[in-house]
Amino acid sequence: MGSLGSGVLHANSDLDLIIVYHADGNAQSEGDRSLSARQYYSRLTKAFITAVSAPMTEGRLYEIDMRLRPSGFQGPVATSWSSYQNYQKNEAWVWEHLALTRARAVAGKVFLLNEFENFRNSILKSYHRENIFNELVSMRARIFQAKSLNPWDAKIGPGRLQ
């Protein structure tokens, strides 16, 4: 998502991530204490976030932003592929679909990367332009109501990025 997904990552970028895994519903990890796929990928994701965002003597490698994952902070840190598809089809807000314009699968098996890209395109093509425009106008109005205009804010305001 964000600058990583759109290919404009720079040294001060944070990583907007959604972690999606593909496993059977009853899949178990190997080892002394087997874990369900959900538990395994949750622990793996948390370890990854810690490793990438931990403070070091020269600073952090990257800040990780997971707020765009399905259900935000209330949702799991790693989501199964089927749950992600269901969420996008049935529960996601328009702004979450718009965020998909800057989403790219950056790791995984090639067939899954292709499957994600096809799914992303199908979601983006399913919207009627008129509905998106009306939703955007409403969303911008709510943003302007909630946040006072700052003349130095290049992001939010008439003629600015948002």
Language-model features and meaning:
Residues M1-Q162:
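A nucleotide- and high-energy phosphate-metabolite-utilizing enzyme signature
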